[in-house]
């Protein structure tokens, strides 16, 4: 399965920062992923079924959690799920306890496409605002001031075309050439989505 967001420059930057240990203990992370396709989905009989936005956008968010933290044993639960304009869910919030705590929100009702990621930690915070395809995309790191105060921050702003598909395709070709295949990620994502969907009873 192609989860191309892993190749977003700021996703790679966030992963490197998390793995560096410079942030200290990671307390919690929240992500929002929204687009404005509710009417398109409603007009498509095969798309406006089942768990709706959950597998559509939620799969990318859960994959991002795996990419950042590599935790395949994490369990998610539904917090909020709505059908504002669609037969299937057009808004979902799911969460996961543990370290760090995770909150993921996805919707088809964000009329301007948008993505955010906020990581709050012992030594500060790190933030992604938007994706390259919707640009500009900004990565911001804030360093905590003790005992309190406005933190100094450093930002990197990218205005460019979406580089992820070409990078993902190059990665795919390298896997084909080496014969290395691992379905653990896909199994984990599908299991998490099914568990959340089943907890809503869908009907």
Predicted regions and their residues:
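Predominantly a Rossmann-like dinucleotide-binding segment in NAD(P)-dependent oxidoreductases
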Residues: 5-76, 82
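Alpha-helical elements of Rossmann-like donor-binding domains used by nucleotide-donor carbohydrate transfer enzymes
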Residues: 9, 13-17, 64, 93, ...
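Short glycine/proline- and acidic residue-enriched helix-loop micro-motifs
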Residues: 48, 150-157
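Contiguous beta-strand/loop segments that form the cofactor/metal-binding neighborhood of enzyme cores
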Residues: 62-135, 166, 170-179
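C-terminal helix-rich "cap/oligomerization" subdomain common to oxidoreductases
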Residues: 97, 170-203
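Short polybasic amphipathic segments
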Residues: 117-119, 134-149
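Active-site loop of classical SDR/Rossmann-like NAD(P)-dependent oxidoreductases
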Residues: 156-170
């Amino acid at each position: 399965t192609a989860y191309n967001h892993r190749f977003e420059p700021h996703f790679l930057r966030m992963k490197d920062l998390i793995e560096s240990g410079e942030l200290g203990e990671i307390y919690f992370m929240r992500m929002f992923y929204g687009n404005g396709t509710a009417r398109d989905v409603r007009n498509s009989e095969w798309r406006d079924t089942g768990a709706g936005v959950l597998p559509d956008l939620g799969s990318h968010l859960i994959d991002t959690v795996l990419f950042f933290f590599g935790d395949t044993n994490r369990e998610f639960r539904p917090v909020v799920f709505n059908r504002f304009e669609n037969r299937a869910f057009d808004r979902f919030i799911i969460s996961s306890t543990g370290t760090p705590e995770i909150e993921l929100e996805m919707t088809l009702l964000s009329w301007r496409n948008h993505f955010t990621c906020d990581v709050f930690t012992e030594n500060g915070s790190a933030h992604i605002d938007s994706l390259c395809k919707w640009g500009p995309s900004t990565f911001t790191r804030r360093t905590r001031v003790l005992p309190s105060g406005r933190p100094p921050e450093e930002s990197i702003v990218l205005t460019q075309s979406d580089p992820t598909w070409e990078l993902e395709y190059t990665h795919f070709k390298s896997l084909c050439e080496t014969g290395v295949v691992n379905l653990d990620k896909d199994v984990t994502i599908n299991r998490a989505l099914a568990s959340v969907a089943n907890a809503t009873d869908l009907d």
